[in-house]
UniProtKB/Swiss-Prot annotation:
Residues 55-264, 348-496 form the Cupin type-1 domain. Residues 1-22 form the signal peptide. It comes from Gossypium hirsutum (Upland cotton). This is Legumin B. One of its GO terms (molecular function) is nutrient reservoir activity. Keywords: Disulfide bond, Seed storage protein, Signal, Storage protein. Pfam families: Cupin_1. Disulfide bonds join 50-83, 126-342. Residues 214-230, 286-296, 303-313 have a biased composition (Basic and acidic residues). One of its GO terms (biological process) is seed maturation. SUPFAM superfamilies: RmlC-like cupins.
Length: 516
């Protein structure tokens, strides 16, 4: 009897020990296990030539008009984009416009510059746990539809998308919806070449939208680029089509269990509406009126931020998702399963009240990285939203571990970028709608004009770091005064002023007598 009890106790102890070990291993490794099977450790990016002697602030080169909007692409052959290994685009979606379902071969990060809308992303194998009610009724009965999660978009949102994940966007707001997006074609998740590719599941978009403005014939494209021709309007180009167009209609009909007539409709052979179509019969979420009123009140608070309430509103970016999770009975835990494959958070808001750095006389900086949007750990991307007031300065610094692709969202200002040779490869005024790439380790400084200066910067690292040259947390403060004095050939008193004259952190207020 005693032997049997001892044996049972030993077996229970062994099972408990293995369970604890498994739990510990899960907790210590959950940050390294991407849910869709990517490698455990971030892989090196595709290396590109970065012999940049001169940079230019760029405007979009290719424009493609659709039925309910337009899509613009920056020239991917520009040296600065080749260096960073990225493509850059902008969607302008009219009211009731639908950006057709599509996916890309590389991770994407986009920013809502203007307007509001609805975003849906479909992860393979995840259940359709959400319901919406259609405005169209059949036999006087409302039709309810099950689907995967929908996300509200509003100005200032940053949204992340893994490679190969299909998504769509609908403008249900009262004004135009403008999105700017960076596609990281140099990311290891993209196992094709470093050319932009967009795969549409529906419609018949122009070929240029599918290829990011690039021509099918590389030689033709290079010749056109050398001649300096600007392709502003390409709305009539054909040859895009969707991925279903290439299948035989009878095989497509068998796969979906439909007749061939409907299968041919899926292939959209005569559809010339483009990539953004008008959604005649939209849909609204439950309690739409109450939610709209809440959004309007929230907008009033953001226009007049109360900094003393910052602690209460730090989680604003994810409160909607958290409410939905509580409604379905989910709870966060410390067992390494905080974010499962199907409940992954893709969106982060950047309201004024959640800024990482704030200077009441200078402006604010808000960072979106893997700490506040964990999916970025697997995409190896991050973002920075900057707001500078009249004549304020963003401290001179360099990006330690990432390229920074800067898009100007409001106002104007001056940006200076310096290479390893101590040469200014960019020193110009920039304004809304322009893009400039700051290569890794190149020193940069930004100064706002009289109208202020705002930007969104996409960075090619999940936790991009900067090293400041001036300010309270700069490299100058970390060097001994004698090292500074001898390095620059100045007196100790001058070195002390160099170290301590600026007590602000990253955003500097304008000094009296300073000029643009």
């Amino acid at each position: 009897m005693a032997y049997t009890s001892l044996l049972s106790f030993s077996v229970c102890l062994l099972v408990l020990f293995h369970g604890c070990c498994a739990q510990i291993d899960l907790v210590t490794n959950h940050h390294q296990d991407p849910p869709w099977g990517q490698p455990q450790q971030p892989q090196p990016r595709h290396q590109s030539q970065c012999q940049l002697q001169n940079l230019n602030a760029l405007q979009p080169k290719h424009r493609f008009r659709s039925e309910a909007g337009e899509t613009e692409f920056w020239d991917q052959n520009e040296d600065q984009f080749q260096c960073a290994g990225v493509a850059f685009l902008r969607h302008k979606i009219q009211r009731k416009g639908l950006l057709l379902p599509s996916f890309t071969s590389a991770p994407m990060l986009f920013y809502v510059e203007q307007g509001e809308g609805i975003h849906g992303a479909v992860f393979p194998g995840c259940p359709e746990t959400y319901q919406s009610q259609s405005q169209q009724n059949i036999q006087d009965r409302p039709q309810r539809d099950q689907h995967q999660k929908l996300r509200r978009l509003k100005e200032g949102d940053v949204v992340a998308l893994p490679a190969g994940v299909a998504h769509w966007i609908f403008n249900n707001g009262r004004s135009q919806l403008v999105l700017v997006a960076l596609v990281d074609v140099g990311n290891d998740a993209n196992q094709l070449d470093e050319n932009f590719r967009k795969f549409f599941l529906a419609g018949s978009p122009q070929g240029g939208v599918v290829r990011g403005g690039q021509s099918r014939d590389r030689n033709q494209r290079q010749s056109r680029t050398q001649r300096g021709e600007r392709e502003e309007e390409e709305s009539q180009e054909s040859g895009g089509n969707n991925v279903l167009s290439g299948f035989r209609d009878n095989l497509l009909a068998q796969a979906f269990g439909i007749d061939t007539r409907l299968a041919r409709k899926l292939q959209n052979e005569r559809d010339n509406r483009g990539a953004i179509v008008r959604m005649e019969h939209g849909f609204e979420w439950p309690e739409e009126g109450q939610r709209r009123q809440g959004r309007e009140e929230e907008g009033e608070e953001e226009r007049e931020p109360k900094w003393q309430r910052r602690q209460e509103s730090q989680e604003e970016g994810s409160e909607e998702e958290e409410r939905e999770e509580r409604g379905r009975g989910r709870r966060r835990s410390g067992n390494g399963l905080e974010e499962t494959f199907c409940s992954m958070r893709l969106k982060h808001r950047t309201p004024a009240s959640s800024a990482d750095v704030f200077n009441p006389r200078g402006g604010r900086i808000t960072t979106v990285n893997s700490f506040n949007l964990p999916i970025l750990q697997y995409l190896q991307l991050s973002a920075e939203r900057g707001v500078l007031y009249n004549n304020a300065i963003y401290a001179p610094h360099w990006n330690m571990n990432a390229h920074s692709i800067v898009y100007i969202t409001r106002g104007n200002g001056r940006i200076q970028i310096v290479s390893e040779n101590g040469e200014a490869i960019f020193d110009e005024q920039v304004e809304r709608g322009q893009v400039i790439t700051v290569p890794q380790n190149h020193a940069v400084v930004k100064k706002a004009g009289r109208r202020g200066f705002e930007w969104i910067a996409f960075k090619t690292n999940a936790n991009a770091k900067i090293s400041q040259i001036a300010g309270r947390v700069s490299i100058m403060r970390g060097l001994p005064v004698d090292v500074l004095a001898n390095s620059f050939g100045i007196s100790r008193e001058e070195a002390m002023r160099l170290k301590h004259n600026r007590q602000e952190v990253s955003v500097f207020s304008p000094r009296q007598g300073s000029q643009q």
